[in-house]
Amino acid sequence: MRQALALTTLLAATVALALPASAGCKEEVLDALDKQRKAPAFRMETNMVSEQGPVKMTVEYMPPDRMRQIVTIAINPVPVESILVAGKAWGKDGDTWKELAPEIAGEMVTQLDEVLGDDRGTIGTVACLGSTAVEGQDLMAYRVENDAQVGPEDRSPDAKEKARAALADETRPLRMFYIDPKTGLPMRSVFARANKLDKPIFKATYTYPPDIKIEAPK
């Protein structure tokens, strides 16, 4: 269970470097994330590479305090499922649900808060890349740079040259963020090296099924 929680934490912490930013682009991404938080429920499905090999994770959110996550690791095909409802958490052992320790529930609450919290102070800078066709769907694409990861502002004489060199680094990590222009909702997020966008380290897709329900196990 803790391994699954660690993987979820890694997803929440995934950040990237980006192209020069635009205030308007940042507002578009922030508006999309705010709209997602206000949705009745949404589902995130991810594929990523971990030390244990390929990982598939499905996480469902029902703001303000409900979450379900199902994690499958390649070396152990039996999925690990857990539920959080109003600060209490349960894990599924075979066909039986068991209440999890308060400290594990607390970790899940923290993860939920990270996803549903305000991103305005942490998202960093954003660059618009325009309309992009993704698997047959036209989406608005963005690259995001997390200022907290970059560190304090570089005021050295060669700061501009350092910035140009960083953007020229084809192995630098990038986060690509995609928004549906019709609904204004986030649709996917990709974390990859700049020269390997077709082989992402982490990829998440977002859907908004109206039938998501998360209840405490009986």
Model-found features: residue ranges?
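Short loop/turn microsegments at loop-to-beta-strand junctions
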Residues: 79-80, 127-128, 174-175
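Bacterial N-terminal signal peptides that target proteins for export
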Residues: 1-9
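Flexible, processing/modification-adjacent segments and terminal tails
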Residues: 24-29, 37, 91-155
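N-terminal leader/targeting segments and the immediate start of mature chains
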Residues: 2, 13-66, 213-218
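Beta-turn initiation residues at beta-strand->coil junctions
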Residues: 46-50, 71-75, 92-95, 146, ...
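Short, solvent-exposed coil/turn segments at beta-strand boundaries
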Residues: 36-42, 59-69, 83-89, 137, ...
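An acidic-aromatic
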Residues: 56-116
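Gly/Pro-enriched, hydrophobic low-complexity segments
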Residues: 138-218
